[in-house]
């Protein structure tokens, strides 16, 4: 992580917490190692648990600018909020998947859905994408629960996502 010194009004220098891309990589306190992959997109991995299964999933962080900087406190705060409320939010995610697909409480979600990735957007909105093992031929197998933060809401498959 690089730290730059910024000038104060009195000409004194103080450390800046701005992080900047270095060889397309940055270390973030929440996400760990992130790699700048293309215009406005950083990619990393995070270890988490959903449906009672621990896994390492992709984190896709979308930023608005292509200037190489990664300074996204809203996104970091959204993940901190999710992690602090995980026990409250995860059942809502499961409930929304059940509702969206018409599945009863006895259905084991991990039999059908594979937790694929977390998508985090500027401003802190983020959602999870899943791979649906039973997707009909010709349809996308990726399904999303979009906007985990600020609220949990089912959005359907990516063919409907615009």
Question: What kind of feature is each model-predicted range?
Answer:
Residues 2-94:
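N-terminal "domain-start" segment
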